[in-house]
Design a protein with these regions (language model features):
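Alpha-helix N-cap and coil->helix boundary residues
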Residues: 25, 42-45, 68
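Short, amphipathic alpha-helical interaction segments positioned at domain boundaries
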Residues: 71-80
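Minor-groove-contacting beta-hairpin "wing" of winged helix-turn-helix DNA-binding domains
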Residues: 63-69
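Short alpha-helical segments that sit at the start of domains
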Residues: 1-21
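N-terminal positioning helix adjacent to the helix-turn-helix/winged-helix DNA-binding module
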Residues: 1-5, 42, 65
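Short acidic, hydrophobic short linear motifs in intrinsically disordered regions
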Residues: 19-34
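A short, conserved structural fragment
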Residues: 51-61
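Short amphipathic alpha-helical interaction segments
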Residues: 36-52
Length: 80
């Protein structure tokens, strides 16, 4: 897994934040827009990287594809 791939996925979630009062993101829905097949290991590894590095966190109400953008994640997408 390349760090660049994970960061493309993170930046692709930016659209999902517009007009929402929450920081809920669903990377699975925007993976293809980032050039990542959401059914491949590369996607899973990218999400794991974003979780491990603190860019996203599991959504408080457990769900398979829902995550919450952290402050670190917001700073990254707003700076790039």
């Amino acid at each position: 897994m390349k760090v660049e791939t994970a960061m493309r996925l993170l930046h692709a979630t930016r659209e999902q934040l517009h007009g929402k009062p929450t920081r809920e993101v669903v990377p699975f829905e925007v993976a293809e827009m980032a050039g990542i097949d959401p059914y491949q290991r590369e996607y899973d590894e990218s999400v794991r990287y974003l979780l491990d590095k603190g860019y996203i966190e599991p959504y408080p109400k457990p769900s398979h594809w829902f995550y919450r953008m952290t402050n670190k994640g917001l700073e990254e997408i707003l700076s790039g």
